[in-house]
Structure formats: C-alpha cells, structure tokens
Amino acid sequence: MQGPLYIGFDLSTQQLKALVVNSDLKVVYVSKFDFDADSRGFPIKKGVITNEAEHEVYAPVALWLQALDGVLEGLKKQGLDFARVKGISGAGQQHGSVYWGQDAERLLKELDSGKSLEDQLSGAFSHPYSPNWQDSSTQKECDEFDAFLGGADKLANATGSKAHHRFTGPQILRFQRKYPEVYKKTSRISLVSSFLASLFLGHIAPLDISDACGMNLWNIKQGAYDEKLLQLCAGPSGVEDLKRKLGAVPEDGGINLGQIDRYYIERYGFSSDCTIIPATGDNPATILALPLRPSDAMVSLGTSTTFLMSTPNYMPDPATHFFNHPTTAGLYMFMLCYKNGGLAREHIRDAINDKLGMAGDKDPWANFDKITLETAPMGQKKDSDPMKMGLFFPRPEIVPNLRAGQWRFDYNPADGSLHETNGGWNKPADEARAIVESQFLSLRLRSRGLTASPGQGMPAQPRRVYLVGGGSKNKAIAKVAGEILGGSDGVYKLEIGDNACALGAAYKAVWALERKDGQTFEDLIGQRWREEDFIEKIADGYQKGVFEKYGAALEGFEKMELQVLKQEGETR
C-alpha cells in the first residue's frame, strides 16, 4: 500500500539523522550524516570547534546545511518516494542559537534546486557559528540572569530553570556584547530546532513552545517572553528589537507552519502539499518517542543520568528544569540532569571486582548485582539498625551543587538522627546497593509532588517507570528503581537505541497531520504504538512496605544533602 510517510530529523551535536515512518509508526527508512566522518571542509572534532581560552564550544552552521543535503541524498539512494511524504518535523540540540543576516529571507526564498544548500545559504547568517550546549563561556551572564529577578529561585519560577551556561538568553547577552555590530545586523535569531524547520519552509519559522523554555527568556506561567529578562538581554538595541529577532511562539506544538519549499519539490520530488510541523528540542522529542502518560517517568541511565517526566504540576526549583510539553497543552516536561551516573556505579563495581577477583570472560557486573540484591534495603539487617546512606561523586555534581567526593552517613528514622561515619561500613560491598539507592532517592526526592495516587489507597507514585540506556540492562538496578520510585504498573526497559529524538519528531508529524479534532498526542500514538516491539517489563514497581521504608529514608537523605552542602560551604 502506498500510504503517507512522515520524516523526523534529529540534528544533534555529532550527526544529522532522518527517520521515515508510516501511519502505523513503523520505521521504513533511516539516513545519517556523521559530521566528523562525512563532512568536508570543517575543522571540527566530535561535531564542534572548541576555543579553550574562552570556554567556547560552537558548530559551523554551514556544516548543518551540508548535512541536510547529505541525508536527503541518502534517502534518495535508498529509493524513498519523496512524493509520499506528507509531513516533516524535527528535533534540535537544545539551547543553541542561529543568527540570520539581513538577506536571509530573500536567500531562503530564491533557492536554485540545481545547487546545494551550503553553496546558496552560507551568506544567510550574520554570524557563521552556533553555540553548542557544551559551551561554558557565559558565567558572568548567568550571574546577571540569576540576580536580575531577585535570585535563582525567582528565575526558575518564571522560566522553569535557573541560569545555565548553555541557555540561549545568557548566550545572546554575551553575543550582543562581544559582537555589537554583528548583533545589529542580525535580522532573526532561531533555535536549532526552528532553524531546521526554516530550511524546509523557505522562510524563518517561529520558535517551538517547548524549546522556547530552554532560553531563560520565556515566562512559562504567563505564556509570553518575560519583559524584564528581555530588557537585560537586549542591550542598546532595545526590547522591541530583540522581540522582532526572536519572533512569535505559537501555542500549538502541532500547528501547520506551511508547505515545503519549492527547492525540495524540484530537487527531490517532494509533493507540494508536504506540511512542515514545528521541530522541538532533543529532550522534549525524547518524551514523544512513546506515549508517555502524565506521571510516567523515564530514566536515562548513561554516563550521566537524565530523568524525564510528563506532569500537570508546575513546581519549579533551581535544581530542576520545567518546559512546556511539546504537544499537550496543560502538561509540562520535568527534567533532572546529573553528571554522576554510570561512571560512579562503575567505580564501585571495579573496586568490588578488584577485591573479589573476576574471571576475564565473566559479566563485569555479576558481583555488583549479586551484592546489591543480597543487601537489605538501606543496609538494614533489622529495622532497629541505622540506615546506611551516602553520596558518591567521582566528578563534581550539579544536583546538588557539590565537589567530587564521597560521604557516608548512618541515619536513624526513629529519632531523625544523622551521623557521618566511616565505621560500620563493609567497603566496597555495602556501597553497591548504597550508590544505586542514593541515585534513585535523589530522583524520588526531587520529583515529589509531581505524581498522584494510582488509586486503591496506594501512595502517590509514577504509573510506569521506563529505563533507557546502558544501565537499563542491569536487573539489580531495575529492581531497586522499582522499590524506590514505585510504578503501579511496573518497571520497563525501553529499546529504541539512539533513535529516541528522531522517532519522537516523526511521531509528532504523524500526530499533527492525522489527529482528530482535540485528539491528544498520547491518545493517537497510544492507539498505534505496539509496545511489545519496544518495551519489556523487567521489574516490579510498587511493593507495599518497601516503598514506605524508602519514604522514611527520604527525610534522612534530604538532611544528609543539606548537611554536606553546609559543610562544603555551598548553598543549594
């Protein structure tokens, strides 16, 4: 059957990927362009250029033009019938900004299908580079953003996050100070996601409602740019000029932005009624890679740990991030990012293997898992024993804001007493379960208040906990995740490889163009998503008694963090 097809693009730091799906959400084509391996003429490493003297990390925008032609050529070689493509959306690395020059709209409109995008659009930008999320050149600007509304908590309350180096607002502030003449000649500023949509539209696309929340400029509660923060950011050119540069932000994440530009119709054979849907950020796109229901939790267990949740509750805090949901009005995306994830667990795993010895061909996690499963929750052999808890940070952490280090405590929930200790711990064995507990207790602590009771008198908790990334293969980690976070429906391993962002973007296009009036993304995708193709239940979720015991531990865990922060002279 020659049904409609939809393309989701993922413009990440190291590659551009396109995933083509049909109405049943089945992937039919994939094309990738690896920036380091496939590009010509750019002095990049891992997709970026680094200026260590100023802590700058940025990408040449022309590289992305070369990549888009490359990915579309790849789909053409595979035999994709472009005329069947009904809709296009995308995901872009969050926070990055693209600076368009005064000729941008004209150059986008006048593309010649006989020439490449790179040849024709390299002159469309007032500045040839886009700051990357790894850039940390904006400490001064972040301090100003945090102070401007009266503190980091006030900024988080307004925009969903405190100031971060990578966020677009602080980056624009630094840009207009460093390059005042270039800033004056900048006609528009796009995010990476809206830049991608602009290329397909043949004119500059509006910002996406979810991705706009990664700027420290969008007031989430007001649903508008924050006038005070624009004032801080705009400099001598003024607020109205910056508003014009940024443009309007439509509320509907599935809005029809317009039809595909003539260039793609003539060069690749796209149909003239192929519709462009707003592209969103890579993190919001990730929660669209499955029908994530409100209160479902998604935990990415890679080198670092990322926790994503869809929630109707807006409860901002300087340690977390809130964004408008990319498709569903009235919902928010909650996000936590930790630097210490898999690396910290591996340190303890290696210490255990050094002590116990391990045959070379054996699973390196076997000892760690066995000890974790044999150790009682919180290391309590009996209820009267103190709970063992600790913080294990081989690298500096951002949640909470602490130097690299290890801290171990005994906590007595009966009287609330907490003591730092090195005695009574059998190291490294006791640390196996303790580190997994520490990581999941931090998630539970910071997502408190975002979940509701699933009914039948059960305490508030997620419906499902989805684990992705390397750590999701580990049965002991999955079991402890369920014991601490709960999950009335259980703990699931989600198998979408590294395709989450592109899949989410493709699903967004399907939803936007095939939804019935008022039909939510979760409803439409939920009806078509074949969960047996993507997920496997790997552990129980809520267990009566155990979940409550960890609830008592949570009070001690929060006390422990505050005590260590106080000792280290830091404040949250």
UniProtKB/Swiss-Prot annotation:
Primary localization class, coarse: cytoplasm
Catalysed reaction equations from the record: D-xylulose + ATP = D-xylulose 5-phosphate + ADP + H(+)
Subcellular location: Cytoplasm
GO biological process: one example: D-xylose metabolic process
Pfam entry (one): FGGY_C
Positions contributing to ATP binding: 365, 470-471, 474
EC number: 2.7.1.17
Keyword tags: ATP-binding, Carbohydrate metabolism, Cytoplasm, Kinase, Nucleotide-binding, Transferase, Xylose metabolism
Keyword match Nucleus: no
Database matches in SUPFAM superfamilies: Actin-like ATPase domain (SSF53067)
Domain of life according to the entry: Eukaryota
GO CC, one annotated term: cytosol
Induction: By D-xylose, L-arabinose or L-arabitol.
GO molecular function: ATP binding; D-xylulokinase activity
Binding site for substrate: 95, 166, 282-283
EC top class named in words: transferase
Function, as annotated: Highly specific D-xylulose kinase which participates in the catabolism of xylose. Xylose is a major component of hemicelluloses such as xylan. Most fungi utilize D-xylose via three enzymatic reactions, xylose reductase (XR), xylitol dehydrogenase (XDH), and xylulokinase, to form xylulose 5-phosphate, which enters pentose phosphate pathway.
Family: Belongs to the FGGY kinase family.
Name of protein: Probable D-xylulose kinase A
Organism in which the protein naturally occurs: Aspergillus flavus (strain ATCC 200026 / FGSC A1120 / IAM 13836 / NRRL 3357 / JCM 12722 / SRRC 167)
Lineage of source species: Eukaryota, Fungi, Dikarya, Ascomycota, Pezizomycotina
